[in-house]
Amino acid sequence: MATNLRGVMAALLTPFDQQQALDKASLRRLVQFNIQQGIDGLYVGGSTGEAFVQSLSEREQVLEIVAEEAKGKIKLIAHVGCVSTAESQQLASSAKRYGFDAVSAVTPFYYPFSFEEHCDHYRAIIDSADGLPMVVYNIPALSGVKLTLDQINTLVTLPGVGALKQTSGDLYQMEQIRREHPDLVLYNGYDEIFASGLLAGADGGIGSTYNIMGWRYQGIVKALKEGDIQTAQKLQTECNKVIDLLIKTGVFRGLKTVLHYMDVVSVPLCRKPFGPVDEKYLPELKVLAQQLMQERG
């Protein structure tokens, strides 16, 4: 059902203007930039997209714009997760209407829901997605929901689930999931362990830093397919040097600043309460943008 979803998927950023409104022109440029750099697909409206500081209407606008720019060109996964099941269902219906290839949802958070309530939440979204496969999104560090291996096994075998985004540093668990579910589409979620995640059984990845250097991650995939571990390690190291800087700056605002210097995003701001990048990092980010543009050619 979801085998066509394998690959390298950029977790799309959401550009805003100086007034904190959605910057539609920059969003369109960013989608095209990702297509041009050879990304297999886009994961829209997730953590990287600052979904949880947007209104439902804004999230729907983002889905619509991305579909207009990319439908039929690359694979599109709509993250529709909300704490509210009804709002998640509304976004899932919109994703179906706009022509997305799949939906995804983080486990509902903040309140201490039971595991059966989590399952019911996913069943309801799957029903509203009307045939689109579900990508379960496991990110315990941000959601606060720490699923056991048995619970993950239950979620990924719910009717309608076709994939799992595993944003966890537990590579042993990644391998266990692959061993238990050989046909499940399995995404690595932490960019800094992308190569290791592939070796542990992931089919590809969904990541934020793919927005600025997606070709490097495609290079890792190619190298590992060819058995060239040395090249894969070298590329992962180069990616991680960038990630080291972004962790210092704040990942999302750092990425937007790099894309600003690449003339893709007009305003390098995240939505409040996120603040701007500390000015002391701007020279390094500008040099990084220049280096990546030169490398990409």
Swiss-Prot record:
It is an enzyme of class 4 (lyase). Its EC number is 4.1.3.3. Pathway: Amino-sugar metabolism; N-acetylneuraminate degradation; D-fructose 6-phosphate from N-acetylneuraminate: step 1/5. The active site is at 137 (proton donor), 165 (schiff-base intermediate with substrate). GO terms for molecular function: N-acetylneuraminate lyase activity. It comes from the Bacteria. Its main location: cytoplasm. SMART domains: DHDPS. It catalyses: aceneuramate = aldehydo-N-acetyl-D-mannosamine + pyruvate. CDD domains: NAL (cd00954). One of its GO terms (cellular component) is cytosol. Aceneuramate binds at residues 47-48, 167, 189, 191-192, 208. Keywords: Carbohydrate metabolism, Cytoplasm, Lyase, Schiff base. One of its GO terms (biological process) is carbohydrate metabolic process. SUPFAM superfamilies: Aldolase. Pfam families: DHDPS (PF00701). It is found in: Cytoplasm. Belongs to the DapA family. NanA subfamily. Homotetramer. Catalyzes the reversible aldol cleavage of N-acetylneuraminic acid (sialic acid; Neu5Ac) to form pyruvate and N-acetylmannosamine (ManNAc) via a Schiff base intermediate. PANTHER family: N-ACETYLNEURAMINATE LYASE (PTHR42849:SF1). This is N-acetylneuraminate lyase. The gene is nanA.
